[in-house]
Design a protein with these regions (language model features):
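HIT superfamily nucleotide-processing domains
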Residues: 1-169
Length: 169
C-alpha cells in the first residue's frame, strides 16, 4: 500500500511571500502576526518538524551571515522545535523559528521551565538538542544560547507571550 504525502500548505504559501533574505535551504519573511516591530519568521524550505532536523551548521551560518548582514540591529532567535501545536495551515508541522530585535543582554532565565542547558552559540545549542521530543531553544545571535529539552507540556504560545511580556517591563 502506498500513501501519498499531502502538500505542505505552509511551504506552498510562504515561499511566495516577499523574502527578506533567502537561499536554497532557508528563508526569512515578516511574521504575519508580529509580537514586536521587526519580528521575522526563519523557516526551512525542506518539510521537517524542526530546524534541529535540518543541517544545523547551514542554519547557523545563514542566520549569522546572511540574515545578520541584512538587518541593522542585533537580533534574538527563538524556536520551539517539533511542537505539535505548530499546526497552522490545517495541521501541517513546519520547521521555523522567531527572530526579534534583542531586548535583553541576559536571556538565561527567560524561560524557567526545566533544566536549562547553556551553550556558547547557536550551533552548539543545536548539537545538544535530542533527536526526539520537543525542545525550546533561544538566545541572542552572536551570543550565548539556551536549550530546554522535553517541553511538551508548555502552553501553545509560550514564546510569543514571554516576548510580549518582556516588552512591557
Amino acid at each position: 500500500m502506498t500513501t501519498t504525502q499531502q502538500p505542505n500548505l505552509f511551504l506552498t504559501k510562504i515561499i511566495f511571500e516577499p523574502q527578506l533574505v533567502e537561499n536554497e535551504n532557508f528563508g526569512v519573511v515578516t511574521d504575519i502576526d508580529p509580537i514586536v516591530d521587526g519580528h521575522y519568521l526563519f523557516y526551512s524550505k525542506k518539510w521537517l518538524p524542526s530546524i534541529a532536523d535540518c543541517d544545523t551548521a547551514q542554519a547557523s551560518t545563514f542566520l549569522h551571515n546572511l540574515f545578520a548582514r541584512t538587518v541593522d540591529v542585533p537580533y534574538a532567535y527563538f524556536e520551539r522545535g517539533r511542537a505539535s501545536f505548530c499546526t497552522s495551515m490545517n495541521g501541517v508541522l513546519h520547521a521555523h523559528g522567531h527572530l526579534v530585535p534583542v531586548f535583553s543582554a541576559d536571556m538565561a532565565q527567560l524561560f524557567p521551565y526545566g533544566t536549562i542547558e547553556r551553550c556558547f552559540n547557536l550551533e552548539e545549542a543545536y548539537r545538544l538538542v535530542e533527536t526526539q521530543g520537543q525542545y525550546l531553544l533561544w538566545g541572542n545571535l552572536g551570543g550565548e544560547f539556551y536549550v530546554i529539552q522535553n517541553v511538551e507540556e508548555l502552553p501553545k504560545r509560550t514564546i510569543r507571550n514571554t516576548i510580549r511580556a518582556q516588552q512591557h517591563l
